């Protein structure tokens, strides 16, 4: 199922486009460019792939600074060429693309979709979730699927957040100390992307500083 929704959702199967919590629920963040969130649950079929590419295009056209894909999938039922095109689209996107495995510890990203972790700008997982079983990494034009020291293990096996971080698989903000509990929510993912420097030198600004009752920024 695909639906365009406002606000933050949980427990929705299929694909759902979510308005950024930053802009939808925090008026103090009004001056920030939006962060879009696309929730993907289930096997990657043609509808899912089209939804992701459409979300990237919408984020680019709408002036969003980032698109977060919240993913829970056991694999893909589309052709290898279709997945290659999707990986290429993510690699070439003019908007930052983040991947977050969630929302629960039972979440998985298995099969060819796990190769998205090698082309996204920021990647993270909720504690207890796993990624892997990538198979042979696909070849892209002008881009490489980078899975760090974990590439061989992920080919036929899987990793937890702790394992993936230690192996250099995850792309996290080096200026933030992320605990072994992982990144527990979409809101946390938005926070972790704040200050992230992209390959082109762009610095993401996803969180607005709020003054407390005494006017001191937090």
Provide a role label for each language-model segment.
Residues 18-218:
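Soluble extramembrane regions of membrane proteins in the secretory/endomembrane system
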Residues 1-26:
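Hydrophobic secretory-pathway targeting helix
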């Amino acid at each position: 199922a695909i639906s365009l929704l406002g606000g933050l959702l949980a427990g929705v199967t299929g694909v759902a486009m979510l308005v950024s919590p930053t802009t939808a629920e925090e008026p103090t963040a009004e001056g920030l460019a939006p962060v879009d969130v696309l929730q993907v649950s289930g096997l990657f079929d043609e509808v899912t792939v089209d939804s992701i590419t459409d979300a990237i295009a919408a984020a680019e056209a709408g002036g969003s600074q980032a698109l977060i894909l919240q993913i829970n999938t056991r694999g893909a039922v589309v052709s290898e060429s279709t997945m290659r095109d999707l990986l290429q689209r993510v690699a070439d996107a003019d908007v930052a693309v983040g991947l977050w495995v969630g929302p629960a510890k039972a979440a998985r990203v298995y099969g060819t979709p796990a190769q998205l972790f090698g082309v996204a700008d920021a990647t993270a997982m909720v504690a207890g979730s796993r990624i892997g079983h990538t198979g042979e990494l696909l070849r892209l034009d002008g881009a490489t699927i980078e899975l760090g020291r974990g590439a061989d293990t992920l080919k036929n096996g899987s990793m937890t957040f702790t394992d993936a971080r230690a192996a250099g698989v995850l792309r996290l903000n080096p200026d933030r100390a992320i605990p072994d509990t992982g990144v527990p929510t979409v809101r946390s993912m938005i926070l972790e992307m704040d200050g992230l420097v992209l390959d082109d030198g762009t610095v993401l600004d996803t969180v607005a500083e709020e003054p407390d009752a005494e006017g001191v920024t937090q």
